[in-house]
Amino acid sequence: RGNDVTLIEKHPDLGGRARVFKKNGFIYDGGPTVITAPHLINELFELFKKKPKDYLELTPLKIWYQFIFEDKTRFNYSGDEEDMKKQIEKINREDVLGYKKLVNFTKKIFDKGFTELADVPFDRPFVMMQQLPALLKLKSYKSVYSLVSSYIKNEKLRRMLSMHPLLVGGNPFTTT
């Protein structure tokens, strides 16, 4: 449209975290990768009678993300629930209890969606209909942001705790 645009990129190829690059004959996705089920990697290697440790090393991160808000407040997001509560308390003490409740509720969602239903084929409408009561109980009709907001009052914390759909190209305000 005739706009004069300058692209600034750290890497030799464009795309930032979403770039694709080639190295040693392989094509890599340079995007953010979160491995939430490392046991599945082990299962894949076992199918080929191989050991993952012979090919890769997974290193758990102490800090998963660091958020820096407009007011320069920093938050180190991690899997350490106690540390998360301490940081939440610094931003809004009232949200610590809401965070505990949110974590407990999302564990139920994970148990249903990943643990119980991950291997269930939804190849017939009846199979999906059987899950309708559980989907309603787990508030699957709410967006991620809306669900988080029902437990968390502080806007910074709401945005931070709603960001996960972004990792797979989703919108926290519309993704359920």
Predicted stretch roles:
Residues E70-T175:
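Rossmann-like flavin
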Residues R1-K108:
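N-terminal glycine-rich phosphate/pyrophosphate-binding loop and immediately adjacent elements
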